Curated annotation (Swiss-Prot):
Keywords noted in UniProt: Acetylation, Cytoplasm, Nucleus, Proteasome
Coiled-coil spans in chain: none
Gene: PSMB3
Function of the molecule: Non-catalytic component of the 20S core proteasome complex involved in the proteolytic degradation of most intracellular proteins. This complex plays numerous essential roles within the cell by associating with different regulatory particles. Associated with two 19S regulatory particles, forms the 26S proteasome and thus participates in the ATP-dependent degradation of ubiquitinated proteins.
Similarity field: Belongs to the peptidase T1B family.
Pfam family, one: Proteasome
GO biological process: one example: proteasome-mediated ubiquitin-dependent protein catabolic process
Cellular component annotations (GO), alphabetically ordered: cytosol; nucleus; proteasome core complex; proteasome core complex, beta-subunit complex
Protein name: Proteasome subunit beta type-3
Organism: Bos taurus (Bovine)
Keyword Nucleotide-binding found: no
Length: 205
């Protein structure tokens, strides 16, 4: 068994028209044993910028803390909010530094540029190789299921409500077909003027 699937979990981000969405499941378990149903996998990295971390739970928390530390230093030094593309480089550097004994987590970044409000999503592998796309990115133990749902449901230029419905259906149906993720879903819809966070009920088994 891969160490990446030891704790389970799923994270997904999607791009809409002038908005992005990021979603994650809420389960923390040890293989098939369920521990808690409110585990945080999505972390704010700015006013309109979030990172989702799927993988080994200890490394999820370690990477989130170390990234927040680097982010605070950056914002103190630069005196401005970080851009999504710069955050991607920061995460890539953090992961690649440990490439010979990597953090077992594959991050997903979603947000809007602080000046232009241009939507941005990307994913990275566990040694920090980035992939920037214009539709959706997925990470976690049920990537095949998530890709299948996203390929079926995603459309270009979705408004925030349509985007919420699409990412919610994709996540809920994907995690239902994976034994080590699920237990509810949390969704953040990021727009120019507001961020909407919704928690979805799912099958609790």
């Amino acid at each position: 068994m891969s160490i990446m699937s030891y704790n389970g979990g799923a994270v997904m981000a999607m791009k809409g028209k002038n908005c992005v969405a990021i979603a994650a499941d809420r389960r923390f378990g040890i293989q098939a044993q369920m521990v808690t149903t409110d585990f945080q996998k999505i972390f704010p990295m700015g006013d309109r910028l979030y990172i989702g971390l799927a993988g080994l739970a200890t490394d999820v928390q370690t990477v989130a803390q170390r990234l927040k530390f680097r982010l605070n230093l950056y914002e103190l030094k630069e005196g401005r909010q970080i851009k999504p593309y710069t955050l991607m480089s920061m995460v890539a550097n953090l992961l690649y530094e440990k490439r010979f004994g990597p953090y077992y987590t594959e991050p997903v970044i979603a947000g809007l540029d602080p000046k232009t409000f241009k939507p941005f999503i990307c994913s990275l592998d566990l040694i920090g190789c980035p992939m920037v796309t214009d539709d959706f990115v997925v990470s976690g133990t049920c990537t095949e299921q998530m890709y299948g749902m996203c390929e079926s449901l995603w459309e270009p230029n979705m408004d925030p409500e349509h985007l919420f419905e699409t990412i919610s259906q994709a996540m809920l149906n994907a995690v239902d077909r994976d034994a080590v993720s699920g237990m509810g879903v949390i969704v953040h819809i990021i727009e120019k003027d507001k961020i909407t966070t919704r928690t979805l009920k799912a099958r609790m088994d």
